[in-house]
């Protein structure tokens, strides 16, 4: 039995065609008959549109289905103008509005990396600004130095997409002197339609990291936590890794390593790295080492390490280097630091960095007061 249209589904084209037009469509279904069926399209002013196509109805399960489409200017569609589709027969009609949906804007997080000292020594300074994730795709990178736009010195811009979100990278290249002689920071600004975010980087002399390895408090649980505190270094790029009995932690099942984001304190940086280990391994006397890699450490030194074991009564070895390459101008040092073993209890609060930092200071002062001696051997 013939009846008025019961349903109408609007659809539209993603993007626009090369001719600057967008296709809008309407679908009606479950009709008892397609006799006398017609579509009418109107713009926001109510005027009828003429570039209309109506396809022959197709019979399917549940009744007939019919489709109509119209082409409109992309500028009108992108300008959020509203269009109306109406389907009718002799028994009634149904209409639906079509308007471009407001795009959800996902605001990006920004990361800015600075040149290494090696690159600066070679006369160049490269900055990489990473924005991720964000949407829609439209964005702008703006670089400034001493309030002057230097975006013309961008070497490369890269954009990638993953599951509807975007990642963008902008690479800026300056001469080393532009970077080191400037009293103002290099600024990378990432601009979206309704949101801007920026990061700045100022030049500073490399600062050698101080490294402290904190033993766990006594625990009756199945696991304990070692903490490596790396502080007062510059620049901010640093890598921390762990060894257990001279094996990389990644090769040992059951250990978990976590490192915090770098903390900025007056343009000097700090980081905490924690290693969660089995209590049985700690009680067995296994030796655990925290290794810190930073560009302020000369190539012939490569890293700083701190080692600890629960029951060790022997001096703790602070290993600054293993070899002395012929091309390296610095001397090799091995420092053996003997300290008394002392026990303490402390509750770690992961959410309170200030208390943790004070604990490290306390540990450091105790170590100074109870230090037995320091012997330094210089290997020519």
Curated annotation (Swiss-Prot):
InterPro entries attached to this UniProt entry: Ig-like_dom, Ig-like_dom_sf, Ig-like_fold, Ig/MHC_CS, Ig_C1-set, Immune_Resp_Modulators
Residue ranges of the region described as CH1: 5-103
Cystine bridges: 26-85, 129-188, 228-290
SMART domains reported for this sequence: IGc1
Transmembrane segments: 357-377
Keywords: Cell membrane, Disulfide bond, Glycoprotein, Immunoglobulin domain, Membrane, Secreted, Transmembrane, Transmembrane helix
Glycan attachment sites: 122, 165, 258, 319
Molecular-function annotations in GO: immunoglobulin receptor binding
One Pfam family named in its UniProt record: C1-set
Keyword Disulfide bond among UniProt keywords: yes
Region (CH2): 108-204
Ranges per topology, Cytoplasmic: 378-380
Any single Gene Ontology cellular-component annotation: extracellular region
Tissue-level expression: Isoform 1 and isoform 2 are expressed in leukocytes.
Note: During differentiation, B-lymphocytes switch from expression of membrane-bound IgM to secretion of IgM. The mu chains of membrane and secreted IgM differ in their C-terminal segments.
Protein name as annotated: Ig mu chain C region membrane-bound form
């Amino acid at each position: 039995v013939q009846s008025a249209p019961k349903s109408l589904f609007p659809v539209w084209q993603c993007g626009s065609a090369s001719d600057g037009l967008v296709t809008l469509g309407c679908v009606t279904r479950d009709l008892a008959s397609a006799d006398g069926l017609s579509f009418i399209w109107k713009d926001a002013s109510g005027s009828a549109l003429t570039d209309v196509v109506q396809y022959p109805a197709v019979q399917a399960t549940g009744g007939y289905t019919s489709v109509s489409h119209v082409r409109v200017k992309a500028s009108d569609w992108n300008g959020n103008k509203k269009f109306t589709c109406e389907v009718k027969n002799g028994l009634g009609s149904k209409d639906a509005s079509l308007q471009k949906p407001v795009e959800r804007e996902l605001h990006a997080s920004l990361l800015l990396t600075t040149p290494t000292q090696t690159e600066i020594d070679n006369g160049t300074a490269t900055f990489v600004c990473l924005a991720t994730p964000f949407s829609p795709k439209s964005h702008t990178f703006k670089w400034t130095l001493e309030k002057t736009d230097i975006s013309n010195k961008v070497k490369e811009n890269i954009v990638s997409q993953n599951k509807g979100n975007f990642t963008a990278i902008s690479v800026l290249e300056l001469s080393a002197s532009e970077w080191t002689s400037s009293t103002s920071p290099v600024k990378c600004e990432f601009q979206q339609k309704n949101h801007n975010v920026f990061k700045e980087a100022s030049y500073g002399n490399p600062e050698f990291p101080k490294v402290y390895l904190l033993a766990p408090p006594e625990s009756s649980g199945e696991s304990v936590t070692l903490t490596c505190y790396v502080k007062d270094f510059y620049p901010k790029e640093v890598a921390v890794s762990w060894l257990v009995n001279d094996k990389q932690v990644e090769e040992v099942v059951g250990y978990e390593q976590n490192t915090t984001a770098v903390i900025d304190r007056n343009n000097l940086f700090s980081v905490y790295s924690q290693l969660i280990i089995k209590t049985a391994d700690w009680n067995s006397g296994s030796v655990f080492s925290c290794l810190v890699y930073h560009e302020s450490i000369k190539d012939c030194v490569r890293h700083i390490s701190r080692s600890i074991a629960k029951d060790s009564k022997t001096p703790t070895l602070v290993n600054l280097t293993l070899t002395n390459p012929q091309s390296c101008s610095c001397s090799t040092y091995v420092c053996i630091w003997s300290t008394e073993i002392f026990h303490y209890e402390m509750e770690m609060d992961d959410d309170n960095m200030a208390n943790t930092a004070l604990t490290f200071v306390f540990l450091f002062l105790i170590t100074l007061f109870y230090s037995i001696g320091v012997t330094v051997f210089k290997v020519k």
